[in-house]
Amino acid sequence: MTNKIIQQLEAEQMSKEIPTFAPGDTVVVQVKVKEGERSRLQAFEGVVIAKRNRGLNSAFTVRKISSGVGVERTFQTYSPQIDSLAVKRRGDVRKAKLYYLRDLSGKAARIKEKLS
């Protein structure tokens, strides 16, 4: 009985429209940032290196290079802190987890664009 109630509550919270994306895709995540009294949106653009599909507990990791330093951020897919998610380009990769990109730099870390 409680399992059905939990599933119903999770389904209500998962009502947000999320575009389909996969590891290797370049995405722009608009994150709500609260600084004192005021709130603003902060864009985080990078390559999705991992995706975890667990219903309401789904998450994805985005990696970008900011002034020569690699920055990774993990987002909860259905978090209220995420305002919007946009896919900028589709990447053509053969693995589900792209952790090997952490060791690569420059042109070696590029990902081919998916043609179709």
Swiss-Prot record:
Keywords assigned by UniProt, alphabetized: Ribonucleoprotein, Ribosomal protein
Keyword Ribonucleoprotein recorded: yes
Entry-linked Pfam families: Ribosomal_L19
PROSITE patterns: RIBOSOMAL_L19
GO CC, one annotated term: cytosolic large ribosomal subunit
NCBIfam families: rplS_bact
Similarity comment: Belongs to the bacterial ribosomal protein bL19 family.
Role noted for this protein: This protein is located at the 30S-50S ribosomal subunit interface and may play a role in the structure and function of the aminoacyl-tRNA binding site.
Protein name in the entry: Large ribosomal subunit protein bL19
Species in which this protein is naturally found: Pseudomonas putida (strain ATCC 47054 / DSM 6125 / CFBP 8728 / NCIMB 11950 / KT2440)
Lineage per the UniProt record: Bacteria, Pseudomonadati, Pseudomonadota, Gammaproteobacteria, Pseudomonadales
Gene that encodes it: rplS
